[in-house]
Amino acid sequence: METPHQGTALFHLPGLFEFYDLYAAFLPLYRAHREYFYDWCAIGSIYGAPSDCLWAGGRVECSDRTPREVLALTREYGISARLTLSNSLLRPEHLTDPDCNALCRLFQEQNDPQNGAIVHAELLTQYLKKNYPSLYLVSSTTKVLTDFNDLQRELARPEFRYVVPDFRLNRAFDRLAALPQSQKDKVEFLCNECCWFGCTERRACYEAVSRKNLGLSGPEHYCSAPGAADGYRFSRAMVNPGFIGIKAIRDTYLPRGFTQFKIEGRGLGSALILEFLLHYLTKPEYQLAVREELYLDTMLDLF
């Protein structure tokens, strides 16, 4: 992977464990055929957590890939690996979990390039800062920071390298433009959220996942947003008022000094993740070539 330069958009991609097989096929192509891909962007990280991770949150990943396998892949291509440790309901007794601590030790030891962790719970933030200081920390979008003053306070915290605000602040351009460059460098925009722009249940949705990971009882969350029965649709995400596509990144965000962009997708199918890779990284004239390299051949039947 080329060294990112000033003004390069860095994409943070989903499914470190869940979509291992997709990335194992895509990354060699990404390295070998740079002419297929935009030269103004690069892969900043791949994020996720193993399926049995107590500290995980946001979404549930299902994968049988081991931490050593995923780290071998990311290190081969010089990509940062981020652990999604965004469970919002952690208590002090959870911090002693041996599997989660072993996971963090491994990611800290194999730290070239530097690996990180996406966090929500304050007690985990402080625990990681003390015990695994080589992991950089990202403030999770599961905090649902919809108030710009809250975002500014989070950006001012030195323990966070990046902060992912709620997607409904993506177009708060007047206030975003007024941030000092040191804070602009920390804002990581969630680009492709499909959630209803008027949703008031995001915290409840994320908390339900946190409870499941901890094995706690509690109410199941059923999304009541318009179109919820259809599940995630990229076409619907594209007309969301908070959507950030490649034109907006090139023409609006990069010129204003913003370079960090998160792509959601954990829990979706790998075919949809490939569509994200095509939209955000791949030049239109080479998208068919990428499909042919990865899966499309003369014998493929869809129906």
Features from the language model and the residues they span:
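Active-site pocket-lining/capping segments in soluble small-molecule metabolic enzymes
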Residues: 1-150, 154, 160-303
